[in-house]
């Protein structure tokens, strides 16, 4: 079992139950899934960019990503509906906990000039999105093998609909959020 998951089950869940006065342990907010999304605008011109993005996302997440298609046609970008323009992967269970642990303790400390994550990234429904500017902060990515530095979004989806409960959960999981 993952260290972070064991810590959540043994201590964090009980602490959150006491602090929010939940009558049942099942009411305690928990992490449901992590969605990693990478938009590849260059895939319009050359599909090799999408292939390299799929490979990088596979290395980072440990799970095969799925290519995403454009919903609408946008003539200014020469984009047609149904054209492949990105990739995403949804992590649940053990892979989710392993990725979160790697993100918190390995990747985020490698970000240059890192001062913590903003509290403004909550969506109002208890979900938190982190924008990562460079994929090279992950140890699986070899700097010499990448064609282009690209970023991606990591969305932490929680079981609660309140940002305050999700904030307490993420702070308890040691996500480096800015004091506020």
From Swiss-Prot:
UniProt keyword terms in alphabetical order: Ribonucleoprotein, Ribosomal protein, RNA-binding, rRNA-binding, tRNA-binding
GO BP of this protein: translation
InterPro entries for the chain: Ribosomal_uL5, Ribosomal_uL5_bac-type, Ribosomal_uL5_C, Ribosomal_uL5_CS, Ribosomal_uL5_dom_sf, Ribosomal_uL5_N
Domain of life the protein comes from: Bacteria
Family: Belongs to the universal ribosomal protein uL5 family.
Role description: This is one of the proteins that bind and probably mediate the attachment of the 5S RNA into the large ribosomal subunit, where it forms part of the central protuberance. In the 70S ribosome it contacts protein S13 of the 30S subunit (bridge B1b), connecting the 2 subunits; this bridge is implicated in subunit movement. Contacts the P site tRNA; the 5S rRNA and some of its associated proteins might help stabilize positioning of ribosome-bound tRNAs.
Name this polypeptide is given: Large ribosomal subunit protein uL5
Organism name: Mycoplasma pneumoniae (strain ATCC 29342 / M129 / Subtype 1)
């Amino acid at each position: 079992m993952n260290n972070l998951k064991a810590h959540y089950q043994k201590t964090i869940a009980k602490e959150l139950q006491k602090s929010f006065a939940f009558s049942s342990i099942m009411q305690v907010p928990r992490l449901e899934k992590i969605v990693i999304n990478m938009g590849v605008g260059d895939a319009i011109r050359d599909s090799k960019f999408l292939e390299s993005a799929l490979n990088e996302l596979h290395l980072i997440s440990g799970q095969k990503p799925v290519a995403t298609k454009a919903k609408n046609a946008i003539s200014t970008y020469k984009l047609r509906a149904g054209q492949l323009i990105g990739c995403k992967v949804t992590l649940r269970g053990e892979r989710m906990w392993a990725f979160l642990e790697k993100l918190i303790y390995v990747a985020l400390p490698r970000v240059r000039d890192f001062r913590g994550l903003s509290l403004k990234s909550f969506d109002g429904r208890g979900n938190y999105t982190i924008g990562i500017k460079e994929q090279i902060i992950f140890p699986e990515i070899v700097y010499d093998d990448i064609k282009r530095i690209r970023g991606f979004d990591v969305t932490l989806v929680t079981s609660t609909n309140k940002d305050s409960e999700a904030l307490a959960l993420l702070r308890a999981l040691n996500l480096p959020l800015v004091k506020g």
